[in-house]
Regions:
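A generic "folded-domain core" signal
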Residues: 3-18, 25, 29-189
Length: 189
């Protein structure tokens, strides 16, 4: 809640908080809703500015800095210089053995969501004795609903499934909080 409150206060302070454009539509690029993209979304996010693409990426503080830190499922937000925002979603495995996952099953309190990937959709790398595999996607409405279910769940297990191996990740409560914070902030953009 503090994440959202600070974000709304940030927008209201500049007089740029509007629910819709004057013509009644909800657009990211109408002048009334455009916000200064260089201003922070929240102090609870990590801001990464891409000077070449002129995009700011906002990631929750729970987002690992190093690729081989831990496995996770987390969304993040991109905002361009025109104030247009979009959501991204990362499924990330790291460990000491390759999974070569092609499928992810997310079990949210017993309800399963399944995502299939082609071999080349998954990025893979290694270093310092660790391996990591991940996909970074534009989430569908179903994916966003799944993220909300994860955040509200008692237990969520994410299975990274390959042909011969799999890895089960239990989503931490800190990641659940990060998920809902990012989704709530995104819904205000």
């Amino acid at each position: 809640e503090g994440f959202i409150r600070r974000y709304i206060n940030d927008l209201q302070t500049r007089g740029k908080y509007m629910v819709c454009c004057n013509d009644g539509t909800k657009k990211m690029n109408c002048p009334e809703r455009r916000r200064d993209f260089r201003q922070p979304v929240s102090v609870t996010t990590i801001k990464d500015y891409d000077k070449v693409e002129n995009i700011i990426w906002y990631k929750p503080q729970a987002y690992p800095y190093y690729a081989n830190s831990r496995s996770y499922v987390l969304p993040y937000i991109g905002v361009d210089s025109y104030g247009n925002a979009w959501l991204r979603l990362v499924f990330h495995y790291t460990g000491d053995s390759w999974i070569f996952f092609k499928k992810i099953t997310v079990s949210v309190d017993g309800q399963n969501y399944v995502k299939d990937f082609d071999y080349f959709e998954v990025s893979r790398d290694n270093g310092s004795g660790d391996v990591w595999e991940y996909v970074d996607i534009s989430p569908s409405t179903t994916d966003i609903n799944m993220l909300r279910a994860i955040a509200a769940s008692k237990e969520t297990i994410v299975r990274f499934q390959g042909d011969d191996y799999h890895y089960d990740l239990t989503v931490k409560s800190s990641d659940k909080s990060a998920i809902i914070s990012v989704l709530d902030a995104y819904s205000l953009l």
